[in-house]
Design a protein with these regions (language model features):
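Surface-exposed, beta-sheet-biased, low-hydrophobicity segments with strongly acidic/polar composition
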Residues: 20-368
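C-terminal motif of bacterial Sec signal peptides marking the signal peptidase cleavage site
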Residues: 15-18
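Repetitive helical segments and hydrophobic/amphipathic motifs
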Residues: 11-12
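Short, intrinsically disordered low-complexity segments
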Residues: 1-2, 22
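Sec-dependent signal peptide recognition
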Residues: 2-8
Length: 368
């Protein structure tokens, strides 16, 4: 009887193994069934940045104006500007002493360190829009080990969140100018020392930023003189819904609402599936399965793959979502998802606003 049982178990093992193709790798499946998600970027002034974790169906909301600078927590010493509030930075020529820099000496440079003025020359004052950090270009140069090699920069603090009424279906994300600062960043052990002051001041403040490797970045609010929590831990978010400074080829920097970044610094890859007419993009999304995934298509060095490509604010029927495309996402834990957008505006009227209001996109997603 024992021999018969062993034989049956061995046979069952062969049958179960024969169901796995030698050319197929096992697919990690996220611990969630997927969902339809309404995101609150906060309405037509889009005050929020929303950090979303697909595998946990969780989100964290922060205000765009809560921070100005992000300090890379890996081995490189790089500093990133808050593009959601239209920040920019320009090196002050021949300046190594921040306290010696006067406002009068910066009059000419202030006319150049601007965002969204349709000047291709202003691209050097913003960071690599693809977000390919730490390797990508940053307006504030890499922080050197020798203090004297670190320049002083003119910092355009960007724009406040707009405070006023906005017509239904429109967006207005830029408020009053937030002013200017001068800044110099040097190393402090394995972290950063930030020297900063208003342009009219002859003495500066200092903050030490210690790297926390559980996160992509440490974030700093210069206006509040302190570190702040913004992004969740590096493996705890996949997508960010935000206002974003991008580049239009030949026209310089430009600011987009309804933008979606993926967490490429944290290891999230994305590619777009665009379905040619007359085939249905919705049907293609519904039919897409794990065996359709093409690993070679995932892009890990550009966080603008979704970007603003999912919506058309000047469509035939007004504000539209493109129904001919969807996105395949691989998170840092190796989980795969398919995702498509279904609405650009608010679906119903409630305490947060009227139906048709911008800043409330809807998407659906499923694990693969």
């Amino acid at each position: 009887m024992k021999k018969i049982l062993i034989g049956l178990l061995f046979g069952a093992s062969l049958v179960s193994q024969s169901c796995i193709n030698d050319n197929e790798d096992p697919i990690a499946v996220a611990p969630i069934d997927g969902s339809t998600v309404d995101i609150s970027v906060g309405g037509p002034t889009q005050p929020n940045q929303v950090w979303f974790d697909l595998s946990e169906n969780k989100r964290v909301l922060t205000k765009r104006t809560d921070w100005e600078l992000a300090f890379y927590s890996g081995s490189a010493f790089k500093v990133v500007l808050n593009s959601s509030i239209q920040m920019a930075a320009g090196k002050i020529p021949n300046a190594t002493n921040i306290d010696a820099v006067t406002e009068a000496s910066l009059a000419s440079l202030k006319t150049q360190v601007e965002v969204a003025n349709f000047d291709v020359n202003n691209e050097i004052y913003i960071d690599d829009v693809k977000g390919n950090f730490p390797g990508g270009y940053t307006a504030i140069g890499e922080v050197k080990a020798t203090d004297s090699e670190n320049s002083v920069y003119l910092l355009n603090m960007g724009k406040d969140i707009y405070n006023g009424s906005v017509p239904l279906g429109s967006v207005t994300y830029s408020g009053d100018p937030r002013g200017w600062m001068k800044i110099q960043i040097v190393r402090s052990g394995d972290g950063y020392k930030v020297k900063y002051a208003k342009l009219s001041e002859s003495t500066h403040k200092e903050i030490i930023v210690t790297k926390n490797t559980a996160y992509n970045y440490n974030f700093l609010s210069l206006t509040n003189d302190k570190e702040v929590f913004i992004q969740p831990e590096k493996k705890k978010w996949d997508l960010c819904f935000t206002v974003f400074t991008n580049i239009i080829t030949g026209a310089g920097s430009y600011v987009y609402a309804d933008f979606v970044n993926n967490n490429n610094v944290g290891g999230v890859g994305v590619y777009e599936m665009k379905i040619a007419a007359p085939a249905s993009g919705v049907e293609a999304y519904n039919n897409f399965k794990a065996s359709d995934i093409q690993e070679s298509k995932f892009i890990y060095n550009d966080h603008t793959i979704i970007g603003a490509n999912w919506r058309n604010p000047v469509g035939t029927n007004g504000l539209e979502v493109y129904n001919d495309r969807f996105y395949i996402i691989k998170d840092a834990d190796g989980f795969y998802f398919k995702l498509r957008f279904s609405r650009l505006t608010k679906a119903t009227t409630d305490s947060q606003g009227l139906a048709g209001t911008r800043g409330f996109p809807t998407f659906e997603y499923k694990p693969l």
